[in-house]
Every structure is written in structure tokens, then in C-alpha cells.
A protein has these predicted regions:
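Small/polar/charged residue-enriched interaction surfaces, especially the RNA/DNA-contacting tracks
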Residues: 1-567
């Protein structure tokens, strides 16, 4: 057997914002609350200060995607379990009986350089990518949560990336595999893995970096003529070594991607509009400017041409990128937070009405992170907790057209005199945008895993209640969506000022057969006998009828709500 070296280059384009954290900067907590500023979570950087996506991060995402595909399809398609072990290396689970050393991976995933054209640096970093800020909402008070303000450096959607993976198959002539050790992969196994990786990327099964539940990190194959190239060479001979070191990197190899269809995800698409306008404001950049510009992000008085001018600098909507030409965006994290807050409210209302002893009537003193950990069980299954990841992903919603803009001005009243308060004139720049659909995805495998873990059931247990609990979680989410369709759940900011109203026109649910849920195609027809919220509730009753009662719940609990108890 001789050594064969491969090099795979895949040309990608970001289909959503991409963030992968490097070394976190230390927050100076000695400063007072009013003097504190956010510390951005930035990409890892090379020695020249350029942001990059580390090969370790990409390799972990690819390995997890391959492992999940094998669990779903077995060894009939793509590499087998043994072949994956040969390719990715040992994971340290062979036990103490083997005297052979752990085998390193045959796959090397190289660092992905991020495109930085047009971006400038600051005092700390040579190149700085755009950042997006967000904050968690206190579930009890409805205000911004303390110690829950986040700022992430990100690469905008639509940027091209080049992913390079090299591999080595076989052993040099005369070298034998130690007894009991895992043999290195052969050329056939390497090419089979590369076909699977290309197929996973092509079918949208791979996401890089963090904030994936907010829809970040998704990539797609480039539209270029040759989205991927695979070359190989045998460097054991002089001719093979020259071939490998040439500009071409060896002989070209044809590889057909594996068909990885069937995402294992339930998809909910909501067609909607907003009669009042949606605003998630772009925060003001940190800088040395104080005084007049200090509150510009909130629409407070800004710089004026004349000292006595009453003009304000309006709060402007957040866009999908740093350019003015980028579309207005309703972040997936914002929608997801609104859905979670309402789901928590519904679940806690039911638990209090049933006088569940594990639910306290007063939880006003809990911090926002503690609130997430104490959320009812079905909420944690869907949205995650401080311990495990949730099953629900909400993608960024882009405006298909900005539409005309208008400046909305308002002022605060003096609570003592009843007149206009001095220096408290605010304004927002609101666009009458036409929006794309809100898209929610539920990872059914993750939901079932969370449900079984919450019930304390091991994987593969017969007579599992995990599927019933998963359907119960869908029922809870369905109630939240019914409230959204009824117009009682505003999105974005300024909801108490009349903004953020949502008018749902249609809702489609697909891919729920794994939970025994049929596809839905519901529309809000004018003059119809049943409104869209009632149609949603009707579908939820059908789902609830197939849910067996949780045996851990006490008397008086039935159907989906019984799974709010006992975990």
C-alpha cells in the first residue's frame, strides 16, 4: 500500500450571518453600571490581526454532521461507523485493553480566511468586521435583562468563503498497522467521505460557528461553475511528489455528492405584514462623542445645525449588513425571544391555575439567566436552557422591499406639571416595509432527545413518552403562534408605543411526519367562517387527541399540558 494525498476545495457563500468566537475579552466589572460598555465577542485572529474561522471549529461541525447522517441512514449510504473512525481518528473510547497509541485523524481542515475588503480597523484590531447587538428580556418585568447585553462580530450573508480539506490515505510501503490498532483509511474511504461532506453542504445540513438557533452560520455552495474541486497524488515517487507540489495539486478526481435529502426538521412558514411598522433599532456606535449624540440611538436630540434647533437624530432600523443598501432585518433572535417569553407566560399561567407546587407565584427577584434555567419543561425543550441546546431555530426575516419611510416624533410628558418634558423629544425612522415570511425550524431529533432527557429515559427505551412530550411541546408553540395570528403578540421594539403589530395572512407547517403531525396550509380568508387562530387551535386539538397523559402528573391533568409537570 502506498500513500495517497487528497485536497478538496469547496467554494461557499454565507447564507446567514456567521460568527465564531475567539478569545473573549475580559469585562471590567469594577466600573459602575452607568459607565459599563459592551465587550464584543470577536472572531479568532491570526498573527496579523485578520479575522478567521478556525479549522478546529469547521472540523467539529463537519464531523458532527457526518455522525448525525450515519445515525439517521446507517451504513447503507456514505461511510460506515468503522470508516468514520478510520477517517476522523480515535475518540478515546477504545478502552484500556489496547496498547496501541491513539490514531490521529486522516483529515486536516484548514483555517478559513474571511473576506475583509472594505473593512477598517481600530486601536485594538487591524481589521474589524461589523457587529450586531442584542439583549435578553426579563420574563417577569418585560424590560431589558441585567447583565444580558451581547455584541457579536459577524460576517454578513452573501460573502464567499473557500474551505480546504486535505487527507492522507494508506501507509508507506513496508509499514504495517500495529496489532489491535485501527487501520488508516484507503483512497475509497476518503473519496466516500468527501462525497458525503459535499452532499451535506449542498443540502444545507452544515452550519458553522455559534448562534445557530438564531439562524446564524448557514452556508451554501457557491454559484460558480465549479463549486468544488478534488485532486490527488501519490508522493511516494518523484513524479508523484512533483505532481503534488505543482500548482494544480495533483490529478483531478470526479466526485458525486451524496444525496442527503430529508432534513429531519419541521418547517413553519408565516406569511405576514405589519400595519404599524416593525422597528429593531440599530444601536449607536461606541465612540468618544458624548453630550448631544449620547442618546441618538433612542431618537433623543442629536447634533443640530443651530444650537436652539429641536431636531432629533432618529433611531434607524437594523439592517442585514453594514451598508445602507442592505435589506432591513427582523433578527431571528428577536422573534425567538418574543416567542419564548409568550410560551413561558402560557406555561406558567397553566401551572399556577393548577396550583402546581413547583411553580412559585412570585419570581420577580430571579435574574434573566436564572429565569431561563427555571422555565417550564416544554419551554426548555423548545428553546433550550443554560444546560442544553433548544430544538427551535428562528431565521432572520428580511424585508423584500424597504418601502417609503416616515419619521415618527413623540415626546415625554412632565409627570409633575403635565406639560412637555424639556429635552425629551424622541423620533424613529420607520419604513412601511414588505416582509419575507417568518421561518421557524424544529429539529425533531433534538426535540426528542431533550424530551427523553427531561423524562429521565435512556435512548432506545420501549414505551417511551418522549414522542408524546415532543408533540406536547409543539402544542405549546402552536398556542404561541395562535396568539401571533390573533395580533396579540407584537414583534420588535416600541410595542407599548403602538408599533410591532403583526397581521398573519397564512401559515404553512411541513415536515412533521416524524411526530405524526400532518402538513398544514392555513390561510386567513376575508369573510371566512373560521379565523386563522381558530384554524390553528383546531389543528392543535387534533394533535392533542393523540397525546397520552403523562403518568407523573397528578389528578386533573390531561393531554399536552400534563407534560408541564414533573421535570
Amino acid at each position: 500500500m502506498s500513500v495517497t494525498r487528497y485536497e478538496l476545495t469547496v467554494h461557499l457563500v454565507t447564507d446567514a450571518p456567521l460568527h465564531s468566537g475567539g478569545i473573549d475579552e475580559v469585562v471590567d466589572r469594577r466600573r459602575g453600571p452607568e459607565d459599563r460598555t459592551t465587550v464584543a465577542r470577536r472572531f479568532a485572529r491570526d498573527g496579523h490581526g485578520r479575522p478567521l474561522l478556525t479549522g478546529r471549529s469547521v472540523k467539529g461541525a463537519l464531523r458532527a454532521a457526518c455522525q448525525r447522517f450515519r445515525e439517521e441512514h446507517g451504513g447503507a449510504v456514505g461511510p460506515t461507523e468503522r470508516e468514520l473512525r478510520q477517517l476522523w481518528g480515535d475518540d478515546g473510547t477504545r478502552g484500556a485493553g489496547s496498547a496501541a497509541p491513539l490514531r490521529a485523524s486522516a483529515i486536516t481542515v484548514h483555517t478559513v480566511e474571511l473576506p475583509t475588503e472594505g473593512y477598517e480597523g481600530n486601536e485594538e484590531h487591524k481589521i474589524v468586521l461589523p457587529t450586531r447587538m442584542g439583549n435578553a428580556i426579563d420574563r417577569y418585568w418585560g424590560s431589558a435583562g441585567d447583565t444580558a447585553l451581547f455584541k457579536h462580530e459577524y460576517l454578513p450573508r452573501g460573502k464567499e468563503l473557500a474551505l480546504t480539506i486535505t487527507a492522507e490515505a494508506g501507509l508507506p510501503d513496508g509499514v504495517e498497522v500495529p496489532q489491535g490498532d485501527v487501520a488508516p483509511p484507503g483512497p475509497e474511504q476518503v473519496e466516500k467521505l468527501f462525497a458525503l461532506i459535499i452532499g451535506l453542504v449542498k443540502d444545507g445540513k452544515v452550519a458553522f460557528g455559534g448562534r445557530q438557533n438564531a439562524g446564524w452560520g448557514r452556508v451554501a455552495l457557491s454559484d460558480s461553475e465549479k463549486a468544488w474541486t478534488l485532486t490527488k497524488a501519490e508522493p511516494g515517487s518523484r513524479a508523484g511528489l512533483e505532481e503534488w507540489l505543482s500548482g494544480a495539486g495533483g490529478r483531478s478526481v470526479d466526485v458525486a455528492p451524496v444525496d442527503c435529502g430529508g432534513s429531519g426538521r419541521m418547517r413553519i412558514e408565516i406569511t405576514w405584514d405589519s400595519p404599524t411598522g416593525i422597528l429593531v433599532a440599530e444601536p449607536q456606535d461606541d465612540g468618544s462623542e458624548e453630550g448631544a449624540d449620547a442618546g441618538a440611538a433612542d431618537g433623543s436630540p442629536g447634533e443640530a445645525e443651530e444650537a436652539d434647533s429641536e431636531e432629533t437624530k432618529p433611531a434607524r432600523p437594523l439592517r442585514a449588513g453594514p451598508e445602507e443598501s442592505d435589506p432591513i432585518v427582523l433578527p431571528g433572535s428577536s422573534v425567538r425571544g418574543a416567542l419564548r417569553t409568550r410560551a413561558t407566560r402560557i406555561a406558567r399561567t397553566i401551572l399556577l391555575a393548577k396550583k402546581d407546587p413547583s411553580t412559585g407565584a412570585d419570581w420577580s427577584g430571579a435574574g434573566v439567566h436564572e429565569q431561563l434555567a427555571q422555565d417550564p419543561s416544554l419551554v426548555r425543550d423548545l428553546f433550550g436552557s443554560t444546560i442544553h441546546r433548544g430544538a427551535l431555530t428562528v431565521l432572520d426575516t428580511l424585508a423584500s422591499e424597504d418601502g417609503p419611510s416616515r419619521k415618527v416624533t413623540h415626546n415625554a410628558g412632565d409627570r409633575w406639571t403635565g406639560g412637555v418634558a424639556d429635552g425629551l423629544l424622541y423620533s424613529e425612522e420607520v419604513y412601511d416595509s414588505t416582509w419575507n415570511s417568518i421561518v421557524l425550524e424544529i429539529d425533531l431529533d433534538r426535540l426528542l432527545t431533550n424530551a427523553r432527557a427531561g423524562l429521565g429515559e435512556p435512548d432506545g427505551q420501549e414505551d417511551s413518552r418522549g414522542e408524546d412530550r415532543s408533540r406536547a411541546a409543539f402544542c405549546l408553540l402552536g398556542l404561541v403562534l395562535a396568539e401571533l395570528a390573533a395580533g396579540t403578540l407584537p414583534l420588535g421594539s416600541r410595542g407599548t408605543r403602538g408599533m410591532g403589530q403583526v397581521e398573519v395572512k397564512a401559515m404553512a407547517v411541513t415536515g412533521g411526519k416524524g411526530l405524526g403531525i400532518e402538513n398544514w396550509a392555513l390561510k386567513a380568508e376575508d369573510g371566512a367562517d373560521e379565523s386563522l387562530p381558530r384554524l390553528i387551535l383546531k389543528g392543535l386539538r387534533d394533535v392533542n387527541s393523540g397525546i397520552e397523559r403523562n403518568p407523573r402528573a397528578g389528578a386533573g391533568w390531561e393531554g399536552w399540558s400534563s407534560y408541564l409537570v414533573g421535570s
